[in-house]
Amino acid sequence: MGEYGVYTTDEFDKDFKKLDRSIQQQIKKEIDQLELNPYVGKPLGYPFFREKKVQGYRFYYLIYDEYVVVFVIALSDKKSQQKIINSIRHLIPFYKEEIRKKLDLP
């Protein structure tokens, strides 16, 4: 397995910027580690849909082995965890199209 490219959604970026700098640094460190092994997070119903916890926050990501890409989708606290997970599950086909666009694939 080679290094995975890591991409983020605009939604994730917006929420990430609102966090305290120290939490941002910890989350960034965890995201950087996904380049080498994206399967470290807790699976959420599918092997390619996972979450990682950092302090009181969780970030959610999708793994696309066929493109060697990790797509970091969203960030939440425990309170909104299930709502975010359900939303991502419904939008999985949309996110695949988004990553294809980011990679300039037809």
PLM regions and their residue ranges:
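A short, surface-exposed loop/turn module that caps and links secondary-structure elements
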Residues: K29-K53, I99-P106
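Short, surface-exposed coil-to-beta transition loops
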Residues: V54-R58
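GIY-YIG nuclease signature motif recognition
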Residues: F12, Y60-Y61
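Enriched for short, Lys/Arg-rich terminal
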Residues: M1-G5, L62-P106
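Arg/Lys-rich, positively charged N-terminal/basic patches that mediate binding to nucleic acids
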Residues: M1-Q25, K101-P106
